[in-house]
């Protein structure tokens, strides 16, 4: 059960999330892997989660009718949000808002087939008071098995 050096799922997700719209990260996505990217901004953490889940389903990164896939994605999203929010997934209640780019990557990072598929969610953007100029950069990464 070795993590393949060329199949670092979290690194790939982070590079995709960090890339600006006009730049393309130099990545070689392994054959059979799936990914999507997008943006979300809100004072409501439920909207942030829903936007990422919708993107993953509409881009066929996860199957819409398989509960364990949605469940794995949810936990990866929550882990990434913990990083962005420093462990407090409250936004509107404490007058915080986020503007994030996200990447969701699904693949097989281990050399053993028994380890199965994994999903990584990377978030990069800003968090702060809902006043322009009152935010700072933040980053989060969540990885979970499917």
UniProtKB/Swiss-Prot annotation:
The keyword Transcription regulation applies. It comes from the Bacteria. GO terms for biological process: L-histidine metabolic process; positive regulation of gene expression. GO terms for molecular function: mRNA binding. Pfam families: HutP. Gene3D superfamilies: Hut operon regulatory protein HutP (3.40.1510.10). Keywords: Activator, Histidine metabolism, RNA-binding, Transcription, Transcription regulation. The keyword RNA-binding applies. Antiterminator that binds to cis-acting regulatory sequences on the mRNA in the presence of histidine, thereby suppressing transcription termination and activating the hut operon for histidine utilization. Homohexamer. NCBIfam families: PRK03065.1. Belongs to the HutP family. This is Hut operon positive regulatory protein. It comes from Bacillus mycoides (strain KBAB4). The gene is hutP.
């Amino acid at each position: 059960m070795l993590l393949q050096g060329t199949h670092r799922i979290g690194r790939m997700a982070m590079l995709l999330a960090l890339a600006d719209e006009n730049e393309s990260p130099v990545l070689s996505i392994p054959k059979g892997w799936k990914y999507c990217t997008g943006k979300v901004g809100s004072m409501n953490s439920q909207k942030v989660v829903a936007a990422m889940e919708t993107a993953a389903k509409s881009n066929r990164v996860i199957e819409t009718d398989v509960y364990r896939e949605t469940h794995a994605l949810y936990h990866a999203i929550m882990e990434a949000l913990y990083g962005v929010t420093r462990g407090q997934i409250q936004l509107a209640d404490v007058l915080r808002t986020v503007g994030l780019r996200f990447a969701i990557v699904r693949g097989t990072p281990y050399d053993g087939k028994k380890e199965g598929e994994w999903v990584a969610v990377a978030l990069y953007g800003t968090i702060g008071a809902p006043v322009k100029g009152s935010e700072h950069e933040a980053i989060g990464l969540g990885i979970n098995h499917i």
